[in-house]
Amino acid sequence: MALLPIAPWRGAVANRHTPMDADAVTRALERSGIRSIAQLSIREIKKLIDTIEGETGQRYIRMEMGIPGLPPSQIAVNAQIEALKRGVAAVYPDIQGIAPLKREISRFVKNFLDVTVDPEHCLPTVGSMMGAMACFLTINRMYANREGTLFIDPGFPVQKLQCRVLGHDFMTFDVYDHRGPKLRDKLLSYLDTGRVSSILYSNPNNPAWICLTEAELEIIARLADEYGAVVIEDLAYFGMDFRRDYSRPGVAPFQPSVARHTDNFVLLISSSKVFSYAGERIGMLVVSDALWNRRAPDLTRYYPSDLLGYAMVFGAIYALSSGTSHSAQYALAAVLKAVNDGDLNYVEGVREYGEKAHIMKRMFTDNGFRIVYDTDLDAPIADGFYFTFAYPGLSGEELLRELLYYGVSAIALGTTGSERTEGLRACTSLIQRSEFPVLGERLAWFHRDHGKPAGPAA
């Protein structure tokens, strides 16, 4: 199926001089069979850009995927090498994780969230995506008469894909206009249906980079307790609200978390961003002690036990992957121990993302773009791993498609559950500072081609 024709107001791209080979971009789009580029997933955008780069030899400014742009923790690398030398590659790891890692995850949660969780209830997973899948497979099956997850959006698009693959229904709303006390009424409008099994959000938020406050988290916690919904808190960007220092173990301030307001929670913690360990696919799934021991008879429709923790480990996780990479567990245990002992400041190593975001946002706004999610309650949005942008007069689909011809990639906000469908998400991680001049040139070129001409002089 060919792409829809270019809108007349744009003119024929092939007749314009653009930074990328326009004919090659158009051919790649037409061959792909894509009808709506705004609906493409992160990986589909990546594949499209890889194809164009491979055919043209021209490089894009890559902002579509949150690939860490920093080297991995050397502590983790060394520990993994040593584990491999000891021969762990020949041994299946326990599904529930190795003891040293479970201890360090528990310590990390205590040190940086001020929350106590039994090490037995701290599990390694093959990335946080597997942790989310395990949650959907168990938590959303605790009650046969419930529908599924309520997503407090915008959010990570793949989590909804996981629900679709499982055949689960879900609900969603864009939280941006429902911050503060207004959040309660919005949540009630969904919880009152009696169909919500779980509530999921990311904090800091991917893609808007807003950060829910303790007061908002308390609202979520109280309503979740009242309605019996489990809160799944995605902490993929743990401690990365750089406006505050969350880096000191056991010392306030602590990373904001619903876990301090309820015992009805699951935490998804990633090693990909904070420790730049994305390639080894290892994350952390932390289940509260109370939830771990909760009985839900409807679980026995799928699992041998009605205990949530047992069903999660020996039902869902076992079926997904019989354990997480043995050597990677030793890597994560080592870096967590260094952080817990105060020997490694985990935040200092990733501040570069915030610094780059500050520069990049200025480059966009200097060239006619605007930041879509630009405030966090009554404060300017923080600089971090992501930011959102739009261009006057263009829809998100039009902007995403046009930017392909200017060598800039991103994803459409519409795929994240955002109501701001005119916008795109930019990730700051993969672009290097040495590429900033190229980004500036391409944005200026885009603005020259798309900016409205000045009106006649008065």
Model-derived features: where do they sit?
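Conserved core segment of the aminotransferase class I/II
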Residues: 261-351
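Short hydrophobic/aromatic beta-strand micro-patches
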Residues: 286, 388-390, 427-429
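Conserved core of the PLP fold type I
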Residues: 85-227, 232, 238-262, 266, ...
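N-terminal small-domain helix-loop-helix segment of the aminotransferase-like
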Residues: 18-25, 31-130, 181-182, 336-343, ...
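PLP-dependent enzyme catalytic core of the Aspartate aminotransferase-like
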Residues: 6-15, 107, 111, 115-117, ...
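AMP-binding (ANL) adenylation modules
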Residues: 69, 272, 377-379, 415-418
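Conserved glycine-rich beta-strand-loop-beta hairpin in the small C-terminal domain of fold type I
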Residues: 326-329, 333, 346-361, 371-390
